[in-house]
């Protein structure tokens, strides 16, 4: 690929908090060399959208890769000049003086292959046909994403990350980095994640995919040519997923059994506030997300299982890691329960690998990793202080 210029944030066009990274501008990185995929096929001439925050130091030792979860993107922090409301999905974590302090670290966010936020994916034009890939876009895996991310690191001249960090699906990518490129990261930070999906989690994903596949507007994944979008299926898929991201405690506090109107109407329309909330979330998601991308990413979640190649033995799988680990879970997260994080911790301890573990008592379920709970952020801040001291940042 062509040489990469290290971008700087665009000048602020409006007032922002002093701990914001400011107005940011993504860059499109093009890779001509084919990327061999786990399924045996290859993809060539692909693009990845990238955002960076902070300054890469002279020896390029202060870089941190932030891996995104299902519906997120490269836009980790800051705002865009033409859309102040589009705040980065982890803006409370990344910025000057924040836990991942951009005064000390150079932070990279990458939109994964197959996504719908600018990187090559099902919505992109297939050079072989001149039409969108649609259903023809190859199935990708967490491992494929990590290989693509490694090429981004190469383009920036980064031989070793100070840390690779992610929550949920992003945490799986961080684990994969520690296994596939063990000498290219000093620290691996895994938050609200799991070393593999349970049968229940795969089942949730299957129900969500079925909602999309059964939408009459899906057209076998080639709905772009029909000028439609399977919004009904996407809406239901998001509603299913959103239920799993919240805890029972959080839902009870937010909604309880509160009615949308004063009286019961004895109908199948929205009666309860929680129904209204789910429909709102589903409608919003269906407007901006792509159905084929949803299928791809949930399948990548399903396939991730580093222990599979080792007879199901996670301890054997993690033996090749060299990084120090921070693993964090949330007590009310039932999507990726603390017990799943402890499986990873045990495998690391069995291999005598350095690992710190924290289970945070937060009421917000799986989505707690996106929120700014003081205990959680203090943990992250302390760990990054340690990394900064190690590398002299």
Swiss-Prot record:
GO terms for biological process: homoserine metabolic process; methionine biosynthetic process. The keyword Amino-acid biosynthesis applies. Pfam families: Abhydrolase_1. Substrate binds at residues 238, 367. It comes from the Bacteria. The record marks 335 as: Important for acyl-CoA specificity. Its main location: cytoplasm. Keywords: Acyltransferase, Amino-acid biosynthesis, Cytoplasm, Methionine biosynthesis, Transferase. The active site is at 168 (nucleophile), 333, 366. Its EC number is 2.3.1.46. Signal peptide: none annotated. It is found in: Cytoplasm. Residues 62-372 form the AB hydrolase-1 domain. GO terms for cellular component: cytoplasm. NCBIfam families: homoserO_Ac_trn, PRK00175.1. Transfers a succinyl group from succinyl-CoA to L-homoserine, forming succinyl-L-homoserine. Homodimer. This is Homoserine O-succinyltransferase.
């Amino acid at each position: 690929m062509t040489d990469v210029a290290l971008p700087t944030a665009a000048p602020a066009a409006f007032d922002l908090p002093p701990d914001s990274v400011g107005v940011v501008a993504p860059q499109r990185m093009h890779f001509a060399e084919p990327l061999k995929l786990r399924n045996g096929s290859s993809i060539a001439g692909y693009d990845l959208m990238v955002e960076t925050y902070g300054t890469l130091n002279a020896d390029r030792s202060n870089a941190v890769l932030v891996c995104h979860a299902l519906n997120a993107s490269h836009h980790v922090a800051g705002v865009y000049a033409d859309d102040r409301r589009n705040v980065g999905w982890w803006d409370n974590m990344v910025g000057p003086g924040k836990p991942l302090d951009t005064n000390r670290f150079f932070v990279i966010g990458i939109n994964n292959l197959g996504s719908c936020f600018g990187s090559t994916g099902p919505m992109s034009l297939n050079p072989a046909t001149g039409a969108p890939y649609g259903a023809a876009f190859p199935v990708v895996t967490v491992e494929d994403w990590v290989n693509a991310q490694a090429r981004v690191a190469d383009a920036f001249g980064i031989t070793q990350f100070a840390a690779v960090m992610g929550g949920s699906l992003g945490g799986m990518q961080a684990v994969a980095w520690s296994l596939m490129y063990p000498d290219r990261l000093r620290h691996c930070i895994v938050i609200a994640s799991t070393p593999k999906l349970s049968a229940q989690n795969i089942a949730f994903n299957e129900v969500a995919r079925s909602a999309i596949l059964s939408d009459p507007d899906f057209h076998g994944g080639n709905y772009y040519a029909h000028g439609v979008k399977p919004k009904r299926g996407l809406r239901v898929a998001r509603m299913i997923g959103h239920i799993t991201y919240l805890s029972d405690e959080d839902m009870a506090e937010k909604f309880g059994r509160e009615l949308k109107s004063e009286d019961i109407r004895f109908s199948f329309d929205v009666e309860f506030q929680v129904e209204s909330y789910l429909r709102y979330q589903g409608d919003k998601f269906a407007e901006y997300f792509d159905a084929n991308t949803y299928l791809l990413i949930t399948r990548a979640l399903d396939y991730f299982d580093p222990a599979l190649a080792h007879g199901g033995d996670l301890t054997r799988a993690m033996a090749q890691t060299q990084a120090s680990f921070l693993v964090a879970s949330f007590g009310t997260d039932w999507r990726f329960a603390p017990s799943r994080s402890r499986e990873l911790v045990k495998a690391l301890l069995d291999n005598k690998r350095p690992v710190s573990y924290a289970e945070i008592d937060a009421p917000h379920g799986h989505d707690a990793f996106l929120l700014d709970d003081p205990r959680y952020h203090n943990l992250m801040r302390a760990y990054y202080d340690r990394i900064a001291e190690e590398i002299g940042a």
